[in-house]
């Protein structure tokens, strides 16, 4: 019956049909891309219902927050909490996501079967990020993630970080000696410290003795390109669409150029490791490619993730640590007194690298230095809203049933600032918003397990957190032992980055 109608119609208007058909296919393709461009396509199908009640939705912020949660997430968090309460939905592109804001909700989420939790295939960013890092460890889910994570975890344990600590200290102490006094006045703190984590982790991955100055410089020359590509992935609309990968655009050429140069540098270091007989982390990991444990792209893109993507995270926290010292002179002075006492002991004692009091001090977890690092991490999550995850099972959070495959994000501002543990009844109002490292004298990390999520929570915590903490402690210890840190500008948040970076200037004054 339908054919009897369509065939004469097509014969009569065949020219229009010829032109219209490809246009229709293009429109349908673009619609599909638009739906998929923001990750998991939910399109209002999320249903959250209290026990025993008819189906109904949670409070919902209909404004598109896909960019806002990166660029102005703190303001978005405060606004949403005031208007929507503790548990709500927000729009991110073409899908809705559940937002968790309390430690209790976070605990209920992560106490569900974590094997059923997975990241969105584009981290909620878009297809361009998949082209750059789509096969790295952080993008994997299920058995693939478990298999790869087990391998990479063995190289980033606390023990591995401690064993590599002398190499870190050697580089940082030389870096301090080489600081130009003309370059430490009115300087961007991120610019000041950004070289430290990159170089230290590169030396760990590729072997300290095999990392020539030329090789390290070649790696560092790739940083601006990678940073630009990451920002494009998260902060532009075009970066969300898969179709743009098939056009010879400037950005896709940059992706190819970066990957080609990075692969060439890394493979040369693998060959150098084998020729010299010196084992390195990168070479050991490459053996798993040769054995078929994971693919070449899994290997090279995870090294990229560790060295370029995650190092920006570490350098940002290191910059915030200096900003907090400049903002809180009393805390800075207390920390300096602790550091100088240890340094004085180091100058008197007869020691080797393994028994150096300064190195022993930085490994301890019950010092004011450690508390300052934890407080910096608490107050400065790298993202105000976490990357979205989904669960393949039905969840119950705050008595609300959450349908499977619903994107879930964590409001890290509310968790890190407003959790009850940071605001005890015997302290002033909004004590959680104050930089107070001494709070950790009576709080253990276990107590704060679901009240601080800078490095993530659950089984997918940041791979490099052990190295990051030691780097931040070393930075503070060596800088404060020689310099007083002061602010020369008002502290603001950078508006053109996907991680929450400080926008200010500091000055280092020799003691």
UniProtKB/Swiss-Prot annotation:
GO-annotated molecular function: heme binding; iron ion binding; monooxygenase activity; oxidoreductase activity, acting on paired donors, with incorporation or reduction of molecular oxygen
Pathway note: Siderophore biosynthesis
SUPFAM superfamilies found in the cross-reference section: Cytochrome P450
BP GO terms, sorted: secondary metabolite biosynthetic process
Disruption phenotype annotation: Impairs pulcherrimin production and subsequent red pigmentation.
UniProt enzyme class: oxidoreductase
PROSITE patterns: CYTOCHROME_P450
The keyword Metal-binding is assigned to this record: yes
Cofactor(s) recorded in Swiss-Prot or TrEMBL: heme
Transmembrane segments: 14-34
Keyword terms of this UniProt record: Glycoprotein, Heme, Iron, Membrane, Metal-binding, Monooxygenase, Oxidoreductase, Transmembrane, Transmembrane helix
Localization, UniProt: Membrane
Matches recorded under Pfam families: p450
Membrane topology: Single-pass membrane protein
Signal peptide: none
Top-level taxon in the UniProt lineage: Eukaryota
Residues bearing glycans: 116, 141, 442
InterPro entries found in the cross-reference section: Cyt_P450, Cyt_P450_CS, Cyt_P450_E_grp-I, Cyt_P450_sf, Cytochrome_P450_monoxygenase
EC assignment: 1.-.-.-
Positions with a binding annotation for heme: 462
GO CC terms, sorted: membrane
Family statement: Belongs to the cytochrome P450 family.
Function in brief: Cytochrome P450 monooxygenase; part of the PUL gene cluster that mediates the formation of pulcherrimin, a red iron-containing pigment composed of two cyclized and modified leucine molecules that acts as a siderophore, a chelator that binds iron outside the cell for subsequent uptake. Two leucine molecules are cyclized via a cyclodipeptide synthase, and the resulting diketopiperazine is oxidized by a cytochrome P450 monooxygenase to generate pulcherriminic acid (PA), which can then spontaneously bind iron to form pulcherrimin.
Protein name stated in the entry: Cytochrome P450 monooxygenase PUL2
């Amino acid at each position: 019956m339908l054919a009897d109608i369509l065939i004469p119609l097509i014969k009569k208007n065949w020219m229009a049909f010829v032109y219209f058909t490809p246009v229709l296919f293009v429109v349908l393709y673009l619609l599909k891309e638009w739906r998929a461009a923001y990750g998991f396509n939910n399109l209002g199908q999320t249903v959250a219902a209290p026990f025993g009640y008819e189906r109904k939705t949670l409070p919902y912020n209909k404004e598109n927050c896909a960019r806002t949660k990166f660029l102005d997430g703190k303001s978005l968090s405060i606004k949403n909490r005031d208007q929507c309460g503790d548990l709500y939905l927000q729009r991110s592109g073409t899908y809705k996501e559940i937002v968790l804001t309390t430690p209790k909700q976070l605990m209920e989420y992560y106490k569900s079967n974590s094997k059923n939790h997975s990241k969105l295939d584009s981290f909620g960013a878009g297809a361009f990020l998949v082209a750059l890092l789509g096969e790295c460890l952080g993008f994997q889910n299920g058995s693939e993630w478990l298999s790869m994570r087990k391998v990479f975890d063995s190289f980033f344990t606390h023990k591995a970080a401690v064993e590599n600590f002398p190499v870190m200290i050697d580089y940082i102490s030389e870096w301090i000696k080489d600081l130009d006094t003309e370059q430490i006045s009115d300087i961007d703190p991120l610019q000041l410290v950004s070289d430290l984590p990159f170089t230290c982790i590169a030396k760990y991955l590729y072997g300290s003795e095999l990392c020539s100055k030329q090789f390290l410089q070649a790696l560092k020359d790739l940083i601006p390109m990678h940073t630009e590509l990451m920002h494009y992935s998260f902060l532009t609309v075009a970066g969300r669409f898969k179709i743009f990968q098939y056009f010879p655009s400037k950005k896709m050429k940059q992706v190819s150029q970066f990957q080609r140069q990075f692969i060439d540098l890394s493979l040369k270091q693998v060959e150098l490791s084998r020729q010299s007989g010196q084992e390195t982390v990168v070479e050991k990991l490459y053996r798993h490619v040769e054995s078929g444990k994971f693919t070449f792209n899994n290997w090279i893109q995870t090294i990229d993730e560790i060295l370029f993507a995650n190092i920006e995270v570490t350098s940002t926290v290191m910059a915030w640590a200096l900003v907090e010292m400049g903002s809180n002179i009393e805390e800075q002075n207390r920390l300096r007194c602790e550091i100088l006492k240890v340094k004085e002991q180091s100058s008197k004692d007869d020691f080797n690298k393994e028994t150096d009091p300064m190195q022993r001090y930085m490994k301890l977890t019950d010092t004011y230095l450690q508390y300052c690092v934890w407080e910096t991490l608490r107050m400065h999550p790298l993202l105000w809203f976490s990357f979205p995850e989904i669960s393949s099972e039905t969840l119950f959070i705050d008595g609300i049933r959450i349908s499977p495959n619903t994107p879930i994000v964590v409001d890290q501002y509310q968790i890190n600032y407003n959790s009850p543990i940071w605001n005890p009844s015997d302290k002033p109002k909004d004590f959680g918003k104050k930089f107070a490292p001494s709070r950790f004298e009576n709080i253990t990390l276990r107590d704060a397990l679901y009240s601080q999520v800078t490095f993530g929570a659950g089984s997918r915590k940041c791979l490099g957190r052990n190295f990051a903490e030691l780097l931040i402690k070393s930075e503070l210890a060596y800088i404060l032992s020689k310099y007083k840190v002061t602010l020369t500008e008002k502290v603001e948040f950078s508006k053109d980055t996907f991680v929450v970076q400080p926008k200010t200037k500091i000055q280092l004054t020799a003691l």
